[in-house]
Amino acid sequence: MIGTAKLLGAAAAAALMAVSATPAHAQDATDELLLRLKEKGILTDDEYNALVARKQTQPAPQAAVPNQTAGATTVPGNNSAEGPQQAAAERLDDKKLVRMMDAGVGFQIGDVGVKFSGSVNGYYVNDNGDKALPRNAVAGGLASVGDNSSSIRNGLLPGFLKVDVTTNQGGWDVGAHFGLYPGINSGVGNSGANGAGLPQALQTSGIDARQTYLTFGKPNFGEVKIGRDIGLFASDAILNDITLLAVGTAAGNAAPSNTSLGRIGLGYIYTDFQPQITYSSPKFGGLQFAVGIFQPLTTIGRNEVNGSPGFQGKVTYDLVPTDGGFGAHAWVSGLVQKHDGIDGLPSYTGRAIDLGAKLSYANFGLTGYYYTGTGVGTIGLFLLSTDAAGRKRDSDGFYVQGTAGFGKFTLGASYGRSTLDRTDNEPVSELVKSNSSYVGQARYGLTSWVTLIGEYTYTRSRAHNGNDANSDALAAGAILFF
């Protein structure tokens, strides 16, 4: 293909040179040739324009005409190239052209852009937890208990392939967005990508279709999103977590599913990917807000029918660093959702709010995060959010994190904890009181796409009755983004 392109490019140049030695009507053929080479993608816009400009600067062949007044011959002015070139430009249908995008992996078809982005990762993980004894039993605990285990698995991120199709119609920027998140580990039957793993032969991995949404907006209007995408509450907590690139707490390591836990339930509640209708404002300086209505989620373990949607909102502020100086990203978000009663249990309303900030200077970063809620549970939204009588439990959590870059190396460390309270009349039990973890991480940027990562995670789970469990995990592998 490259050889063909060079050959045709040479032919175009030869045709161009021939213009000066052929009659004027041959210019039409040259214009047509250049146009066809551009339409087929052999000539880029820049190459086409350069050849056209070069052609226009060359003197056109001119016939001598008699000088009626002096009996001599004269040469007329050079205006003959303008007509054929203008005609060629008018014949060009820009919507038939396929162009390479300025950035990313994708292409432009007329007014429509198609962009692909994605990631693949894999890690060797060795997880060593406490023995499975009664004193180590914690209901809702995330520290591993049982035999030492090894696995080759995904980290907190599964793989993903995202496709964005965008254009402008009638002054509106519109887009269709699809995100597929396949894992490398085998799953159990039809339990879904986030179900239990099954490390046996003749099994297949799952695909998590997390993102399916449309967008439309204008620069001065903002953007409307309709479909399934990441939530607003607690989304910045996970997106700024260093374990997002690696493994973190490796729950279920003996039979891994699509993802590890990272710091989910160990400093923040998982935001989740949810059906929603969300409006995001334009940026006012560095300030932006978003609000949305969401598919109401049921209490995990109950199957109530909820008559009202959930509501979430977020405000962010960005200070972009200049010349490696000080930068900041700060956020506050919240959610409210009413749960209707079922089977004699009362209705309740879950509420939560969080706030966080990531500060950066040169190659150093510091992140702090905190959340508090009632009736929202821990680990995932509305998991363990009420007691057996339907009364709301309170919960909170935090994490702190620091990073330092040295050339292609980045070192990071973090600590976080999530706490779940008993209700006033709830008996003491093995119910989880807190999950916490320490993380140490080292990264090396092998290429612009590939990062090598090594990580150590210590996880501790404590129950309200005093039970306690601990585990250590070592992970080493790589992640690729494009």
What do these predicted regions represent?
Residues 115-117, 173-177, 223-225, 288-290, ...:
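Residue-level detector of the transmembrane beta-barrel scaffold of outer-membrane proteins
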Residues 2-14, 21-121:
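N-terminal periplasmic/intermembrane-space "pro-region" immediately following the signal or transit peptide
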Residues 110-112, 170-171, 219-222, 285-286, ...:
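Short coil turns and loop connectors of transmembrane beta-barrels in diderm outer membranes
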Residues 160-162, 211-213, 276-278, 312-314, ...:
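Membrane-embedded beta-strand positions in outer-membrane beta-barrel channels/transporters
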Residues 102-132, 144-298, 307-309, 316-319:
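Outer membrane beta-barrel
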